[in-house]
Amino acid sequence: MLLGYGKVRTFVKLQIKMIMKKSIKRLPKRTQEELTVLLDLVRKSIGNCQMVILFGSYARGNYVLWDSNIEFGVHTSYQSDYDILVVVTGQIKYVERKLHRITNQYHDLFAGRRHAFPQFVVEHINTVNRNLEVSQYFFTDIVKEGVMLYNSGKHELAKPRKLS
């Protein structure tokens, strides 16, 4: 208990559970459509896909749909990309080649309109879990802020160890 301003205040230590979000409904409809197409392409092409997780600015909600500027007479533009972790069993190199083809298919499908670019990170489930068990920042951040777009249900993500 702490005393302050004449009142007794009790502070309770809360344990924050890392529960990954599972819905993209808060994102714009157009973004939902693009992510759904990407997810369908990934699931159809990669048989050993165990999980697909959106992370980064779109998962956090601080994405930029489109921004353009003219500075010193030069036109520049920016938009956030889709950061997507694809968790697999089996060979990663094989999956990376397929994701390159998927990216090209996706760009062909949305060629007539401005669309976000996907950036894929591919990791084996064992690598992801080993890194979570030692609380590696990149992976714990993905679990904390990410959105689970697909889960085969065959594997679970490890619980990050508490850092002291």
Predicted regions and their residues:
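Catalytic core of pol beta-like nucleotidyltransferases
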Residues: 2-53, 58-78, 88-164
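Short, aliphatic-rich beta-strand segments
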Residues: 83-87
